[in-house]
Amino acid sequence: MDLPGPIHEILVLFLGFVLLLGGLGVVLLTNPIYSAFSLGLVLVCISLFYFLLNSYFVAVAQLLIYVGAINVLIIFAVMFVNGSEWSKDKNSWTIGDGFTSLVCITIVFSLMTTIPDTSWYGILWTTRSNQIVEQGLINNVQQIGIHLATDFYLPFELISIILLVSLIGAITMARQ
């Protein structure tokens, strides 16, 4: 969407705030149904970010795939689980939980301080991709591949790590 600057900034700040609240809801709510609905809110906010960035296809794909399929599947699976199992486990924090929280907070703060100080445009891969694209000897599919392997390398790797962690979590939950 081509919005005026102040309106665009207000929408980005509002969506970011709702995204943070939804993320906290996913983590902090003890009822898994409420947590799944918070995840749906987070995924809808991400889709709205894509709309603001004029990437309509990715926004609709985000809504259809993640909100429409995966989140509904999560809610469906949670409803099959016996509700009394969730309320029985009222353990307080253990040493392992505290250690894991400390490690996660340390990683988040180190990334928050490292990423803004890195000059991503000075990386050799991005200059190579511009030279290859300027030659015009490749088609659109190859250009997408080059951009995924060069310009969008960091987001692509972060998404793969998130998918790996979710796969490990799903396997762990299935074994129990």
Curated annotation (Swiss-Prot):
Residues spanning the signal sequence: none
EC numbers on record: 7.1.1.-
Principal subcellular localisation of the protein: plastid
Membrane-crossing segments per the record: 10-30, 33-53, 60-80, 95-115, 152-172
Membrane topology value: Multi-pass membrane protein
SS bonds (residue pairs): none
Pfam families xrefs: Oxidored_q3
Record carries keyword Cell cycle: no
Reactions it catalyzes: a plastoquinone + NADH + (n+1) H(+)(in) = a plastoquinol + NAD(+) + n H(+)(out); a plastoquinone + NADPH + (n+1) H(+)(in) = a plastoquinol + NADP(+) + n H(+)(out)
Enzyme class name: translocase
Subcellular location field: Plastid, Chloroplast thylakoid membrane
InterPro entries for this protein: NAD(P)H-Q_Oxidoreduct_6 (IPR050290), NADH_UbQ/plastoQ_OxRdtase_su6 (IPR001457), Nuo/plastoQ_OxRdtase_6_NuoJ (IPR042106)
Entry keyword set: Chloroplast, Membrane, NAD, NADP, Plastid, Plastoquinone, Quinone, Thylakoid, Translocase, Transmembrane, Transmembrane helix, Transport
GO molecular function: NADH dehydrogenase (ubiquinone) activity; quinone binding
One GO cellular component term noted in the UniProt record for this chain: chloroplast thylakoid membrane
Subunit composition and interactions: NDH is composed of at least 16 different subunits, 5 of which are encoded in the nucleus.
Assigned protein family: Belongs to the complex I subunit 6 family.
Functional summary from the UniProt entry: NDH shuttles electrons from NAD(P)H:plastoquinone, via FMN and iron-sulfur (Fe-S) centers, to quinones in the photosynthetic chain and possibly in a chloroplast respiratory chain. The immediate electron acceptor for the enzyme in this species is believed to be plastoquinone. Couples the redox reaction to proton translocation, and thus conserves the redox energy in a proton gradient.
Stated name of the protein: NAD(P)H-quinone oxidoreductase subunit 6, chloroplastic
Organism from which the protein derives: Brachypodium distachyon (Purple false brome)
